[in-house]
C-alpha cells in the first residue's frame, strides 16, 4: 500500500500558475495533483490528438473551484466536492481557480503530457 502527498510528488509541468505534479502509483496508474488557474483552457494544447481532445481517462476529485469539460457531444461543469470520471475525448477549461487530484493510466497519461509539453515548446 502506498500514500502520496502533493509536496512529495515530482513536478511534471509548470509555468503560468501551473504546478502539475504526477507520479506512478502502481498497477499501471498514476496520481496527479493539478491546480489550474482561472481561465486555463487546455484545448489549444490538445490540438493534434485524436479529435483534438485528451484521450486518457481520469478518475478524480475536485477540491476547489469549477471546471468545464468539453467533449465532442457537449460540455459539463464540475465543482468543488464532486468526484468524477472523465472518459477519453475531453478538453478542460478552468472557470475558477481549480484544484483536483486524479488517477489515470500511466501510459496514456504520459502520452498526453508529452504532447502538451511539445505544443508548449518544451
Language-model region placement:
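Short acidic-glycine-tyrosine-enriched beta hairpin
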Residues: 71-90
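A short, N-terminal "cap"/entry segment at the start of jelly-roll beta-barrel domains
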Residues: 1-43, 50-51, 117, 122
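Conserved hydrophobic/aromatic beta-strand scaffold that supports enzyme active sites
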Residues: 20-22, 31-33, 59, 75, ...
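A short, polar/proline- and glycine-enriched secondary-structure boundary/capping micro-motif
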Residues: 43-45, 79-81, 111-114
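Short, surface-exposed beta-strand-loop junctions and turns on beta-sheet-rich folds
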Residues: 39, 75-77, 107-109
Amino acid at each position: 500500500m502506498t500514500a502520496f502527498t502533493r509536496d512529495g510528488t515530482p513536478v511534471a509541468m509548470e509555468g503560468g500558475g501551473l504546478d502539475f505534479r504526477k507520479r506512478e502509483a502502481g498497477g499501471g496508474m498514476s496520481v496527479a495533483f493539478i491546480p489550474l488557474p482561472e481561465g486555463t483552457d487546455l484545448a489549444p494544447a490538445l490540438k493534434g490528438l485524436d479529435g483534438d481532445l485528451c484521450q486518457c481517462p481520469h478518475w478524480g476529485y475536485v477540491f476547489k473551484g469549477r471546471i468545464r469539460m468539453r467533449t465532442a457531444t457537449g460540455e459539463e461543469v464540475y465543482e468543488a466536492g464532486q468526484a468524477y470520471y472523465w472518459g477519453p475525448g475531453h478538453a478542460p477549461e478552468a472557470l475558477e481557480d481549480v484544484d483536483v487530484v486524479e488517477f489515470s493510466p500511466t501510459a496514456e497519461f504520459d502520452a498526453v503530457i508529452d504532447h502538451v509539453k511539445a505544443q508548449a515548446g518544451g
